[in-house]
Amino acid sequence: MEKESVYNLALKCAERQLTSMEFSNLYKEFFNEKFPSLIQEEEEDTTTTANINEVKKASDLVDTPSNNTAATADTTHLHEALDIVCSDFVKILNLEKPLILADYIVEVLLVNYNSDMIKCFLPKLNSVRNSLLLAHFFSKSCSFFAKLSDTLIIDQVRKDLGNVIVPNILSLDMNSMNKELIAIVSKLLQTTLKLSPSPILLTSAGCKNGSFTLLNQLSQTNKLLFKRVSQTFEAKLHFKDTKPFLNKDSTNEFVGSPSLTSPQYIPSPLSSTKPPGSVNSAAKYKDMKLLRYYKNIWLNNKIINWEISNPDFLSKYSAITSSIFQESFNSVQNLDQLLTDLIETSFTCFAQFVSNKQYHQANSNLTLLERKWVIFITKHLPLLILENSSRSPRVVTNALDNIDEKVVKAIRIYFTEKDDNKTNNEDLFDDYPSTSLDIRHDFIKGLIMLNLQPASVINNYLREDQMIDTSILPTRDDLFVRNLQGIQEVVHNTNSFIISSLDTLELESITESITHDSSNGLFQVLHNFESVAPTKQREIVKAFLSIFEDAIKELNYNRIAKICALLFFNFSHSLTTILSFSSPAALMKTLIKFVDLSRNGRNGSNGNDESSEYETINISLSFSWAILLIINLTQTYGISVVDVALKYPELSIKNSFIINFISNLPNVSDKYYLEESNVNDSDMLTKSHNTVQSWLCDLFVNGSITDQLIQNIETRQLANLIPFIVKQVLLSVEIGVLTDISSLIGGFEYFLQPLLLVGLIKTFYWLEQFLSCVKNDTISEDILQGIFNLLNTLFNPVTLNEDSKAFHTAVLRLNAIPLLKVLRKFRVQSQSNYGIYSSDAQGDPNLEPLIAKLVAVLNVSPVYDVDPRIINSENDYSRKQLGYGKFLILNENPINKIMTNQINSFWSLHSSTYYNLDYLFELIELVTPKSFLFDVLKTLEYKLATYGVPGSENKRGSLDSEHVFDYFFYFLVLYDVKTAEEASQLIEYMENDAKKSKGDVDIKGEDLHEKNDSAEVRQETQPKAEATQDDDFDMLFGENDTSTQAYEEEEENEDNDGNNRTNNVPMIKAEETPSKTNKISILKRHSFAVLLHERKLLNDLALENGEITKTENEKFISYHDKYLCMLKTCVF
């Protein structure tokens, strides 16, 4: 028996494949025989348990040497025995043997819970080198703790957590563990810590270092698990003499959200370069509401940049305060408090958004950013609450109850006016009862569907005279569709549902059904996408995009065309919602790869083969639909093809068809080349000339196109050939060379065939500039009618192929707004009406169908950033001129006044920008980033030097001025940067002080000679008086009024439509793929970071040459360093 060991026993049991319970029984018998004295002592201890208190008291009173010696001997004997057994366990774990060996150890240690043995065994785990068995041991242990229900064992585990289990696990060598082991250890710690009812205090520095190492390793491999584990650590682990993981937003625990009327004390951000005594000065900024501003800008940027679905969104939001403020906080904000704060902040920011829209940007239509906000609040917030809260209903109700009344009023009035079609000239203080609902109720409905709130709660947030029948509200997140019999069915398998729906979907029907009563399930879901529960929306998005990627890999052209078409039309804002749940750049990358890398596949195909012809049509349509979707993503959502190509190395810029195509959308060359990259090849030029001649002959002479002609040209070549032909024909008609329009109509009708539809894309963009020129030229009425007649062949065909119907509607939508603008100019005024209102207008009989068609296609599905009067019924007596631009920035105010309003907002440290961010971004593009930056800097310098900071007791203090620049540079950084990766690259770029020659710097040398008065200083003769804080709607949120409406009248003949650009398609020049060193500077070529850094390098050169003074250089370096400091501290 002396030679036997637990090690040998375990091996024999494993060979016989005994269960862990059977091993446990044999182990107990072995231990009884191996260490009989310990068993006897244990039994004796058990029989005397009732007298343990008396014995303990006696031992305390009489501490004899004999007693001490006996106790020490027993303890030593026990430790020796346990050490022998635990050493055998370690030997077992180091074997390359069956996994059941680890089960045996878990059974002995945990199932038959032995605190002394665990304390002896865990420190030895560092000597285990077999990661497979070790991982299995930890996994089984995790499973045991997760299922543990025995209260006696739970009590003992809780006692051992702080001094045995957690310290020993955190003391393991985390650096030597692989990814799988790191994840398993993290899950084990997360599971065991959940058993602790209160935080555990750890005093060992090794534990602290181990936790940081573990989280660091985990963050690189599993971000979702990292978020959960870090949240558990924040709540359950405290280290001696260290700050908690998550800091609360303020020293006052009740300041969890922006207060609108009476903001509590919020510490001011302090730069690391400020003097130590500046902390006392921070108390003077009680009314600056800086924290509200930082959260407002951060949330808006996350929503604008499609970052709201990131798994680390909540943890990043929680880190805003600690990243900006250097104050130390002692209290920990748990997840419920954090979510309450996020809910309040979101509604406050949304109220500020709609208020800016109503009172500062009354001539703009900000529907895209507004829709993004609505999706975030009604879909993403409920998901965050579902996955991170304790499920307590009070998390939401507390937040909704704490929202300031002015926020509620602003939201309510906005939605009431939106529903009732009121004008902004009515009484702003009118607060009459209305039955309209607002975004708060849509938010609550989403929570009800996820069982996070009872249905009855919605009535608590209605007016006293309102009531909703809660029985009709859905209380489950099931996805319903209506079958052919009209019966609703529940969708159980989303993936198979989408695939089957796509296979049965008829593409031509998606734009024909006005009532949207199609029996196709996917069509129904997308047309009612706003009413789908957030969980199902996310599930649909994931499955939909996965199916799309598979279709592209498998070259399932029919499915590709259908998916692109459904996404393009954005039914019920489905595409916008899909982009909010996914990565728009990833979708764009997939589309670019498909368009650029896929081959045409039509060359040499047999035109007589019916299946081959069907496949040829599918190939051509899938290619054409993909181009339409790319243009839509670029034009509507601002996703740049060049930026995406720069981001992904597998995409080419130089030889990209789609980048070149989009860059030249409105331009049709006077010469046609089959291969534009090889224009000097004489053979290619001859072939191109012959191709054009053959097509013109077949279209307008022979009256039919031969199969050989179609088979010998690729779809991408047709995309440029057909616009070229249309241009030559229309120009010939305009100058009177072609007069027989009837002979041309037949040829134009061919352009509507499925294989040739791709040519209409460029055609409709070019038509805008062509019609503008025609309007400005003096041509006869007959020629004008002939042009309109030809255009009606393309706009309103008498017959249209079934495969062409949906695409025809889609391609008309792309450039419909600019075309409507120019076509309406051809209308003739029938009466003057003294110029009071826009009077009745009449157009050519061939003109009105063109306008009506464009209005009709725009009403098929949502359009963004468009004056709703453009696409609604004709309003002959509209008080305001129709605005066709995205933002009519100069229609009501001159640029000086607009800039002054915004600069005053920066200067006064308001809790939001004066104008909404999307409007501001357009403004920056209009005036150029360079002018915006230096105008704001020079004006702020002047205002701070002359007036100081409004609302500050120490108005002229240098620290006060620092806060204003911190405020402004925070805006600049978040304007430039979308992700932490971009921030890291920009930091590396800006910290590179290598000298450049003047030729290498983008900024012109003469800019150095600008004096302080070269940029117009936006100033008033005197600072404006403070606005009273109880004014409900002059700056709704208790800030000073920065409006400059009292300025002297500007000249009325200024350019009032500076933003009515012909189209929104950027002109991009394809370049060589950039090297790694300058990639970020090209990707961020329009950023303030590149502007500041290039100017800094140029200033350094100028200082060496004596062109500027050292003081001027140091002043600019301080701005460069402030941007860099903010770049390092901001949360992305």
Swiss-Prot record:
Signal sequence region: none
Further remark: Present with 2491 molecules/cell in log phase SD medium.
Pfam families in the cross-refs: Med5
Quaternary assembly: Component of the Mediator complex, which is composed of at least 21 subunits that form three structurally distinct submodules. The Mediator head module contains MED6, MED8, MED11, SRB4/MED17, SRB5/MED18, ROX3/MED19, SRB2/MED20 and SRB6/MED22, the middle module contains MED1, MED4, NUT1/MED5, MED7, CSE2/MED9, NUT2/MED10, SRB7/MED21 and SOH1/MED31, and the tail module contains MED2, PGD1/MED3, RGR1/MED14, GAL11/MED15 and SIN4/MED16. The head and the middle modules interact directly with RNA polymerase II, whereas the elongated tail module interacts with gene-specific regulatory proteins.
Gene name per UniProt: NUT1
Compositionally biased tracts (Basic and acidic residues): 998-1023
Coiled-coil features, chain-numbered ranges: none
Function (record text): Component of the Mediator complex, a coactivator involved in the regulated transcription of nearly all RNA polymerase II-dependent genes. Mediator functions as a bridge to convey information from gene-specific regulatory proteins to the basal RNA polymerase II transcription machinery. The Mediator complex, having a compact conformation in its free form, is recruited to promoters by direct interactions with regulatory proteins and serves for the assembly of a functional preinitiation complex with RNA polymerase II and the general transcription factors.
Protein name according to UniProt: Mediator of RNA polymerase II transcription subunit 5
Lineage of the species this protein comes from: Eukaryota, Fungi, Dikarya, Ascomycota, Saccharomycotina
GO molecular function: transcription coregulator activity
Predominant subcellular localization, coarse grouping: nucleus
Annotated region (Disordered), positions in chain: 998-1070
Family assignment from sequence similarity: Belongs to the Mediator complex subunit 5 family.
